[in-house]
Amino acid sequence: MARLNELYKNEIVPQLTKDFGYSNIMQVPKIEKIVVNMGLGEAIQNVKILDSAVEELAMITGQKSVITKAKKSIASFKLRQGMPIGCMVTLRREKMFEFLDRLINVALPRVRDFKGVSGKGFDGRGNYSLGIKEQLIFPEIEYDKIDKIKGLNITIVTSARSDEEGKALLKQLGMPFRN
């Protein structure tokens, strides 16, 4: 069992039940899934960029990624409907907890001048999104083998009903918030 999953079941659930006064442990918010997305506008001109992005995302998450396609055509961007413009991975269960553990304890501390993640990334329903400017912070990516620095978006979807509950859950899991 993943370390964070064990921590969640043994320590976080009782703590959050006490803090928010839940009458049932099923009311305690939990992480449902983590979506890692890499949007690549440059893939319109150069399709090879997309191949390396798919490979890097698979190394970071440990799961094969899905290529995302444009929903509609936009002439000013020279974009046609159905063109590949990015890739994404949805993580659940064990892989989700292992990825979150690596993100919090290994990857985020490797960011230059890291003071913590912003507390403003909540959407009003307890889900948290953060952007990472370069994929190099993950130890799985080798500096010599990358052709271009690419950023990625990470969305942590929780069952929390409010931002306050979601932030309390992520803080207990070890997410380093700035404020």
Curated annotation (Swiss-Prot):
Record NCBIfam families: PRK00010.1
Pfam family, one: Ribosomal_L5_C
Coiled-coil positions: none
Keywords, in A-Z order: Ribonucleoprotein, Ribosomal protein, RNA-binding, rRNA-binding, tRNA-binding
InterPro entries according to UniProt: Ribosomal_uL5 (IPR002132), Ribosomal_uL5_bac-type (IPR020930), Ribosomal_uL5_C (IPR031309), Ribosomal_uL5_CS (IPR020929), Ribosomal_uL5_dom_sf (IPR022803), Ribosomal_uL5_N (IPR031310)
Gene Ontology biological process terms from the UniProt entry: translation
Entry annotated with the keyword Ribonucleoprotein: yes
Upper lineage: Bacteria, Pseudomonadati, Thermodesulfobacteriota, Desulfuromonadia, Geobacterales
Gene Ontology terms for molecular function: rRNA binding; structural constituent of ribosome; tRNA binding
The family this protein is said to belong to: Belongs to the universal ribosomal protein uL5 family.
Database matches in PANTHER family: 60S RIBOSOMAL PROTEIN L11-RELATED
Any one of the GO CC terms: ribosome
The protein, known as: Large ribosomal subunit protein uL5
Subunit structure, interactors included: Part of the 50S ribosomal subunit; part of the 5S rRNA/L5/L18/L25 subcomplex. Contacts the 5S rRNA and the P site tRNA. Forms a bridge to the 30S subunit in the 70S ribosome.
Record has rRNA-binding as a keyword: yes
Function description: This is one of the proteins that bind and probably mediate the attachment of the 5S RNA into the large ribosomal subunit, where it forms part of the central protuberance. In the 70S ribosome it contacts protein S13 of the 30S subunit (bridge B1b), connecting the 2 subunits; this bridge is implicated in subunit movement. Contacts the P site tRNA; the 5S rRNA and some of its associated proteins might help stabilize positioning of ribosome-bound tRNAs.
Record organism: Geobacter metallireducens (strain ATCC 53774 / DSM 7210 / GS-15)
